[in-house]
Swiss-Prot record:
It comes from Anaeromyxobacter dehalogenans (strain 2CP-C). Part of the 30S ribosomal subunit. Contacts proteins S8 and S17. May interact with IF1 in the 30S initiation complex. Belongs to the universal ribosomal protein uS12 family. Pfam families: Ribosom_S12_S23 (PF00164). The lineage of its organism: Bacteria, Pseudomonadati, Myxococcota, Myxococcia, Myxococcales. This is Small ribosomal subunit protein uS12.
Length: 123
């Protein structure tokens, strides 16, 4: 345990809080270009083919992000907007692609929770 004079001279070092979405660099969203669009399988108790994309961001980071909703139109070189938010059963996927912006079209025929999937109101 340090003495009072040692603390006066040096002080205590602050603990660094680990960021959950470091590639965003404090921004709410970031734009990027898809370098690879593919499906992957989730962790142990679950079973599915989850749609994910590898995205090169404007700040140089390359991240894996989840494509939410049923069906998508994304392919290599599609420009997308990503937000933070991990997918619990996909290790290493810490970002979501925002549907209905840039090249990612909204989910077709969606009636409820439309704002999360970029779906326009059915008229």
């Amino acid at each position: 345990m340090p003495t009072i004079s040692q603390l006066v001279r040096r002080g205590r070092e602050r603990l660094q809080v680990k960021k959950k979405a470091p590639a965003l660099k404090e921004s709410p969203q970031k734009r990027g270009v898809c370098t690879r669009v593919y499906t992957t399988t989730p962790k142990k108790p679950n079973s599915a083919l989850r749609k994910v994309a590898r995205v090169r961001l404007t700040n140089g980071f390359e991240v894996t992000s989840y494509i939410p909703g049923v069906g998508h139109n994304l392919q290599e070189h599609s420009v997308v907007l990503i937000r933070g938010g991990r997918v619990k059963d996909l290790p290493g996927v810490r970002y979501h692609i925002i549907r209905g912006t840039l090249d990612a079209v909204g989910v077709q025929g969606r009636k409820q929770g439309r704002s999360k999937y970029g779906a326009k109101r059915a008229s």
